[in-house]
C-alpha cells in the first residue's frame, strides 16, 4: 500500500489515497452486519489509539480497502473509535474521535484495539487495560514490545485474546 497526497501541518493524511466510492463507504452508517454470498457476516468493531501519521494511515487503509480486508479476514472491520487528545474538524472520521480510553474499554462491541501512539506511556497502560478487558491489541511499537512484550503476551493468553506486533 502506498499513500498518496500530502499531510496537513499536523502530519495528518486524512483519506488522501481513497477514491470517492471508498469515501462514501467509509461514511455510510452500517447496521453491524452485512450479507455476502448468502451468509450474514458480523461486523468487527475496532478502535485506534492515536491519530497521527500512523493512526490516520491505519484508518485510511481500513477504509480504502474495506472489501478486500473483509474478504481476507472473513468479516468486515469498522473503526468505531479513534482515541486522541486533539479534535479533527472536517475530517471524515471526526465523529469517531474520543478523548477518554474508558469509552473504548467499556464498549463490549470493541474487540480489536490498534495502538499507534508510540513510546512507552500511555501506550503500555492502555494496551494492558485493553488486554485485561479481553480486547485483542495490535501494535508496531517496538519500544513497547521490547519493554513489556512478555507481560502483554501473558495477559493476552490469560484473557483469551491476542497481542499482535511486528
Predicted features along the sequence, with ranges:
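Predominant activation on well-ordered alpha-helical scaffold segments within soluble catalytic domains
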Residues: 9-20, 55, 59-63, 153
